[in-house]
């Protein structure tokens, strides 16, 4: 009897093999590790994929509309993936003659497709009939053994849904991108690689919509009236924003030389319930707000923590913690860490988590497994502690906060101020990532007279809608039903890679904006949220066995064909507009000679650089190292654009000879050091601008400008 277990990643195969037997032997084939053990006359081989081994590819790339596609080995399609061949060869060799197969890839859509394709194409189609499925949410020994001893059938509806998603994304992305690129090439004889996608383009459309709201926004002046009183009290006039200067002047006149009389004091005790457990979206949002991690980075770190067995499966929508995960056991294990123990010991029995409404049939909310980590890097440690403290805090008591709202009369004008103080810290003692409002209450009572030191009148303007950051865009996509928990971060990353968007506070550049404007004018369906949402619903219906994979794909081909026909009818207009936008997007500034500084590509060095549009009359050039972004921010010294580069991201002037790149400090105070409490200031170093502690060299805390701006 020979059994083959197919895992998703090498680390997972090691964990699973060692959990199932003490007699596991590690071997390798073509440098691919695999594990074997024999028990009770059964030989078991544990081998892994390395993520996706197969990818969709056109059967005939010369087709006008690419609808005929098939799965091919990833190494045949992408030269950078040659290493994948060894994994495919290893699975083929080790699975020959096997009597039984176990699909042990991650229990989600992607993991299901990875394992299914490995079985179908590497092991042979007959392997599918001999295969069962392991379902686990952590890579702990207990969960692995339980999943192995209680296998389930492969869910072929989940397989079909996953394959349909891949097919839809491929058909829309490849065809629309091809048609847009061809429209520019056939109109201008220039090659410009343009990209569009089933979810990517509606996402970009949301950002363009916000960009237009900001550009078209007309600020309206207004006035705020405040009273500065004794005991450092600042009270606000009840009118709030006042849009007529005459009204503001009338209030100021009436308050002149008058004291404030306490008219009413309202005290309330407010309960602050513990936070709910993390699902992937809320973890990404919290990590962005606390640490400045991009959603994609958070997802990568969380996946690493899961693979190492320290936390549960991250790609979950659940905010539920079922009893079956073993609260007591996890907390007891965490208590082996002295810092965690203080918080665990303070929890009161019986343990009952404060859960959210969201559920996920496949996995519980993200939680620590209880296995204490070793050798984590700084960012992994940060995210691990965030997950641990969140887990502990959901079992803690409510926090109680007392609020004091005081109404004041200054002559006939009503003002008010509010204060908050903590009565009981509750869960806030266990979750150090929340702001705590704990203010001093003034010793006053109704009827008291307070001295007015000054009546302030602040002139302000209404502000446009805020730009999205990566975390708020993830929330917006989730709210609108676009993408999935697993794909949203990658969609945003693609928009950055395509140079359609830039900055921590996301700004759409000229090419991205013109692309959406052009598509909306000539083929609006491409940008449609409704179309994308419709297919998301149908993909879920495939999983629920309400509709077939083939019917959804055929329906998509009909709709896509209509979109492509619209592009084809307006090819010359679309090509001209997109090429013009592309040319504008390449301009990064103005040269001293009066020409434009534009991004250029060197066929000799196979890299980009900035050069003058007046070449060969003007031969000014600036190097652009790989991984560098040219920003819209201008150098304060020479006026050239700033660039962003390196990890962590640093800033410097485009001109490497500019004096701004020296080591002088700007001394701009940007915050408080979290380690020592001194001021954080902008500094200039060898590699550009960064944030450092003013307490240097005693305190060596630093971070990038981008991390600071993300706050």
PLM regions and their residue ranges:
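Intrinsically disordered, low-complexity regulatory segments
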Residues: 1-174
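Basic, low-complexity terminal or inter-domain segments flanking catalytic cores
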Residues: 2-4, 121, 177, 295-296, ...
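Amphipathic alpha-helical transducer elements in NTP-driven molecular machines
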Residues: 10-13, 17, 43, 81-88, ...
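Long, highly charged, low-complexity internal segments
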Residues: 41-45, 51-82, 191-303, 307, ...
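Phosphate-interacting basic helix/loop segments used at nucleotide- and nucleic-acid interfaces
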Residues: 76-101, 206-207, 286-287, 385-392, ...
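C-terminal or mid-to-C-terminal helical accessory/interaction module adjacent to the motor/catalytic core
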Residues: 141-223, 227, 268
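Extended, well-folded interaction surfaces typified by the phenylalanyl-tRNA synthetase beta subunit core
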Residues: 307-312, 321
